[in-house]
């Protein structure tokens, strides 16, 4: 029986840049040894793995780290209280969202931000 989804591992070119970016968004740093770091928001953790560590792994890890575009077709959804206010807050600290807040038929207001490795984060507010 499934219990919970609590960790996403993402290969990154620069662990420190990813940690800094996600801390700016409001994530909490869990640990950072320089080649692997974790941040968390609520019960979900994001793990950043330096691409160069894949050189020390088997071929399947190397393919994941280097061979394919990062985040293609994947959107990581993060709920916020007020999408417009959070959009403005990010712009004020120098983070440029990819899209402006938009209302969708599924009754959410959403906007997208790309992280330093181009992973797509969707910040959304429930409208109903």
Description of each model-found segment:
Residues 12, 77-80:
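Short, solvent-exposed loop/helix junctions and linker helices
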Residues 17, 83-87:
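Short, conserved charged micro-motifs
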Residues 9:
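Polyanion-binding surface elements
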Residues 14-28:
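Amphipathic alpha-helical segments
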Residues 1-6, 28-78, 87-114, 125-128:
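Vicinal oxygen chelate
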Residues 120-123:
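Short glycine-/small-residue motifs
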Residues 18-22, 90, 118:
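Conserved active-site tyrosine of GNAT-family acetyltransferases
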